Amino acid sequence: MALLDKANTETYGTPEPTDVTLTVEKGPFIVVTGHDLKDLQLLLEQTEGKGINIYTHGEMLPAHAYPFLKKYAHLKGNFGTAWQNQQKEFDHLPAPILYTTNCLMPPKSSYADRVFTTEVVAFPGAVHIDEKKDFTPLIEKALELGGYKEDRMFSGINGGKKVTTGFGHAAILSHAGTVVEAVKSGAIRHFFLVAGCDGAKPGRNYYTEFVKQTPSDSIVLTLACGKFRFNDLDLGEIGG
């Protein structure tokens, strides 16, 4: 984890707490899912000035917190939630999806022609972007599909219109004094790390119900795709 953190922060800067919208603006766009920040960077470079917006999906959400990536004005927001909801969320999507690393649910026929893969991800019939990283076919598909005709407001699992990301160890430690004082004063009495990968089985709402019931004097930290069960909830703030 230390090596991954070092590589990401030295390349893209230290993550900053960031609000991320779930609204998709009208016009051509591309959805990028997976974990590979380098692929996202290359796509942002190749789409700059082409009138195409980029939206993260799933574990690509933290990209919005990195200063180097945030500088791209067409990195607009996040679309959808976790991996197990791909078939529902991508159904008839008027945009292509780039899968970088990890989870790919078998595409439905309604969007199979919009699936593009790269690196270790592949699927029969899907266009695979090789190591040259020429995203021209993906860009052309986005322009062909055209996106939504009007802005579309989406929400998280619990109806929230935005999510937050970027509360990494550096961000927390930069406010260590404030946190310690809040603990001493009793403003913060609990820390909960709600972490883990999610699954597709219906009724898996333990994470959501747990977080909803955490007391107001608690801090909730999260890891992995289980966060989409509750990261759109407004839990308020402690001391700003």
What positions do the PLM features span?
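Metallocofactor- and cofactor-centric catalytic cores in central/energy metabolism, strongly enriched
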Residues: M1-G240
